[in-house]
Amino acid sequence: MNADLTVVSPQIQAQILAEALPYIRKFHGKTIVVKYGGNAMTEERLKHGFARDVILLKLVGMNPVVVHGGGPQIDNALKKIGKQGTFVQGMRITDEETMEVVEWVLGGEVQQDIVMLINHYGGQAVGLTGKDGGLIRAKKMQMPDKEHPGQFLDIGFVGDIEAINPAVVKALQDDAFIPIISPIGFGDDGQAYNINADVVAGKIAEILKAEKLIMMTNIAGVQDKQGNLLTDLSAREIDEMFEDGTISGGMLPKISSALDAAKSGVNTVHIIDGRIEHSLLLEVLTEQAFGTMIRSH
């Protein structure tokens, strides 16, 4: 289905809207948490389409909450100061200098770009970091050393979430704003921590009792070792894929967070291809199934 209403006939436009009606009714008043990342954040056409999609969800009565990443933008900023990004088990090693770059890029450049685009198209977006309203309290991550059981790797200012205070997000939702959250947490001493955006999105969805968690990525969904798309995954199947190495690298925190959200009561969890224009609307407002659904059982 072509979701761009500017290039189809009035009859097809009416058909699309009619198909969306049951979903608009079903999800009216519900919270939809979207992890926004990948090409959808870097390609101009997709960026503008995403902004319009989020506004439409808000206008028809849903409560979208956006948690954004920014890995490519951080890498580009680090290159400008002669640093190379390094990852362990899908997590970015974050020394003091890198943490300063992460704060500036995520909480400044990337977040403001999203906010300005949504506001440009008539929405009301407000940017938040974990420090705002005490939204994300974090502590230094203790990452197990897989090669030395019982020991831990020091990966710098990478954080684990200790607590989420949803009050500021709920207040914005009640006032018709769209929260745009940067995945930066803060410790009790004020230290900033870099937190994986997938982890933040999953925990936000859990705390807000979201109807849906949608993770946008650069692939069609979760794939097996032969590259075949897996449209539906249970907790047991995911555990097996962790064990045999099918899921690795940056997909580790993504799938773990998706599964945790499903187990914690988020009704539906999907990993979708953000390279498809209007993929967010297709997921929420049509019968068209694509990507991978994560199930807790």
Curated annotation (Swiss-Prot):
Supply one GO BP term: arginine biosynthetic process via ornithine
The keyword RNA-binding belongs to this UniProt entry's keyword annotation: no
Cellular-component GO terms for this entry:
cytoplasm
- Report residues binding substrate: 70-71, 92, 194
Q: List the disulfide bonds.
A: none
According to the UniProt record, what class of enzyme is this?
A: transferase
Where does this chain mainly localize? cytoplasm
Q: What is this protein called?
A: Acetylglutamate kinase
